[in-house]
Amino acid sequence: GAGAKLSANKPLALIFEGYTTLIRGVPDLVLMLLIFYGLQIALNGITDAMGMGQIDIDPMVAGIITLGFIYGAYFTETFRGAYMAVPKGHIEAATAFGFTSSQTFRRIMFPAMMRYALPGIGNNWQVILKATALVSLLGLEDVVKATQLAGKSTWEPFYFAIVCGLIYLLFTTVSNGV
């Protein structure tokens, strides 16, 4: 994504600019519902036209596709910003030493980019962890769904909401330490 946005190929750069603008501008929950139901409708329209049966998308698959699609836009911006933050002198020095473009990227640009990208990658990871709570709306049995069901069956929804929050806090705290 970042390479496409920085590409000299204007149509490709415009497509990815539109993708990141759209994804970053529309709430995650709305996108999740649009992708889950929209993809299902589109696939069933195709299978109906081909005379085949209906397709039911597994909520786990839908959740993975949706989170990947949404947060791909955020990671695209993280890597684009990191690429642009590397001083041009690094590339000039690599050229002066006779590095090929792939050697320049692998030995100079990528390590330098990662210094700038790591804070954004960590932040995106934290947001993805918390966004997994939204996939329960697609019917996926996750932590939120399990605690919601436990709260309904015991008539103690507040207690289980606190438990759910603590579980997510544990996930994010442990992943911060990694």
Regions found by a protein language model. Give the residues of each.
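Transmembrane alpha-helices and adjacent helix-loop boundaries
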Residues: G1-V178
